[in-house]
């Protein structure tokens, strides 16, 4: 059986022209990077809900996030899980950082490849509570589009009017990296000239924390939050849940060079 090969007429170079971050260390790339260089940790005791009955009581959560700072109105915010809001905020920063001009003429050559490992746990828990308390009529009509993983990529395209490929691959903890790779391949094979890529997560909820605790995956080093994440250490005892988003703008080199990106 012969191996199938896809012909690429001319190998296209790909560059990063924009970066956006929403992390436990900062609400933008600059603050996050400065904190990393200073050796700071974003892992702290969980204050989002009562964790007294959980073996793991720490996480790396985003702090002081305000959706309105990223042109997400309260009305729209009620339609989106936090992972969508984090990712959209990071995309706003990345696209601004890239100084990307989006027009009717180029919108079909600009796409999105952004995913989430788990998706909308907070939204799922909230609507399950509504169901239990008031029956199915109390469930938000925006529950499904506000919780499923592909809607972050969808919301980015909606915000900017992007008409290129729209991808949302889910591969657990490698989701962000996987989408970056697929976005790059999309440009390489000529299906787009620009791709907004990355991942977003918000899994620090009772269900998320409880689920990972049940499979004994999390560190219980609650008294040493900043020292809990140590994957290659002999004394490691699990990982730490982390929330936030990281978005890149990938661009075909000649295009980026032409516009002095």
Task: Label the model's feature ranges.
Residues 48-101, 149-163:
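A glycine- and small-residue-enriched flexible loop/hinge segment at structural boundaries
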Residues 2-11, 27, 38-46, 77, ...:
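Acyl-thioester C-C bond-transforming condensing/cleaving domain
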Residues 28-31, 35, 83-90, 175, ...:
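Generic hydrophobic secondary-structure packing signal
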Residues 2-57, 61-70:
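Generic N-terminal targeting/processing segments that precede catalytic cores or assembly contacts
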Residues 21, 80, 169:
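Generic anion/oxyanion-binding catalytic loop in active/binding sites
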């Amino acid at each position: 059986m012969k191996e199938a090969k896809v012909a690429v007429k001319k190998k296209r170079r790909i560059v990063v022209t924009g970066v956006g971050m929403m992390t436990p260390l900062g609400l933008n790339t600059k603050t996050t990077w400065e904190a990393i260089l200073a050796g700071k940790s974003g892992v702290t005791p969980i204050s989002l809900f009562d964790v007294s009955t959980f073996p793991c009581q720490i996480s790396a959560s985003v702090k002081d996030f305000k959706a309105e700072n990223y042109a997400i109105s309260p009305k729209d915010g009620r339609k989106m899980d936090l992972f969508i809001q984090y990712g959209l905020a990071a995309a706003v920063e990345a696209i601004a950082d890239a100084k990307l001009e989006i027009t009717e003429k180029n919108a079909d050559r600009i796409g999105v490849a952004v995913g989430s490992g788990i998706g909308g746990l907070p939204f799922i828990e909230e609507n399950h509570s509504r169901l239990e308390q008031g029956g199915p009529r109390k469930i938000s009509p925006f529950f499904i589009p506000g919780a499923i993983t592909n809607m972050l990529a969808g919301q980015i395209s909606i915000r900017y009017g992007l008409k290129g490929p729209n991808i949302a691959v889910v591969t657990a903890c490698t989701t962000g990296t996987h989408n970056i790779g697929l976005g790059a391949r999309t440009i390489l094979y000529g299906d787009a000239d620009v791709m907004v890529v990355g991942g977003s997560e918000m899994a620090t909820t009772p269900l998320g924390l409880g689920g990972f605790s049940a499979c004994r995956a999390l560190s219980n080093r609650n008294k040493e939050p900043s020292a809990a994440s140590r994957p290659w250490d002999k004394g490691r005892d699990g990982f730490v849940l982390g929330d936030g988003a990281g978005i890149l703008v990938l661009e075909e080199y000649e295009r980026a060079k032409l516009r002095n990106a």
